Amino acid sequence: MITLIKTLGTAALLTAGVAGAARAADIDDRVTHGYADSNGVKIHYATMGSGPLVVMIHGFPDYWYTWRRQMEGLADRFQVVAIDQRGYNLSDKPAGVENYDVRLLVGDVMAVIKHLGQQKAIIVGHDWGGVVAWQLAINVPQVVDRLIILNLPHPRGLSRELAHNPEQQQNSAYARRFQQEGAEKSLTAEGLAGWVKDPDAKKKYVEAFGRSDFGAMLNFYKRNYPREPYTEDTSPVKKVQCPVLMFHGLGDTALLSPALNGTWDWIDKDLTLTTVPGAGHFVQADAADLVTKTMRAWLLR
């Protein structure tokens, strides 16, 4: 079964975002911080609430704090855990491109789940966190209870669009730049935080990026992002075996919405796809209230 939802306009999104920012201003005082060991790599996480485990995985450029509004909205019914991926903020930053292989990133999430005494979790991922989340669901299905993806198409969809869609090829030029040697030298903490709209949050982001390793951030692209010449993945499909909720801000210029087409063919359970006009790549921030309320309703159904 597939449910398609198209909702909200720009004005409503802006109102929701301002309200969410005010409520989340002091979340630092209400989370507990911890570390899990992932084969010698220390993975930092922030957690709040109790109940079924929800693990949230950020993308680029970001850190655990991106989930603050969703954490607040779920913590009365769930234990919500937001991690810093390796290379970011308070997590370890191992040297070497090979240490950012997606299989190791998957292992980091599994280490957090095990560290918290659980065998499975609801997995939430945005951008590169979405890459990790998809790979968990596809290759380690026994640890994924349900899957929530934000602005990251299924890998089959992205593979197809990179191979055949000139607009997606053009809009992925940033990734090709990131794959070049020394690309991190052009990055600054202030520049990476440029997408953050709330001034107080932006200060936190600049501090977090100051603790991060820019080269490590780009190793995600160097190790895992497809390289030219792009080819479509036509290998046998391993279907996702759990229910899936997807959000896609339609203003995303990095990951275009045509990559969503066909997603239902790669999922064996129900898929709920929520497209959000007026929101961009960081839909969890641009449409914070919508994302949180939809996520909560879907999880509690």
Task: Put a short name on every predicted segment.
Residues 1-9:
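Bacterial N-terminal signal peptides that target proteins for export
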Residues 9-17:
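Bacterial N-terminal signal peptides
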Residues 20-24:
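Sec/Tat signal peptide C-region and signal peptidase I cleavage site
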Residues 25-31, 41-43, 53, 81, ...:
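Flexible "cap/lid" subdomain of the alpha/beta-hydrolase fold that forms the substrate-access gate
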Residues 41, 47-92:
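Conserved HGGG/HGGXW glycine-rich cap/lid loop of the alpha/beta-hydrolase fold
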Residues 279-288, 292:
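Catalytic histidine-centered segment of alpha/beta-hydrolase-like enzymes
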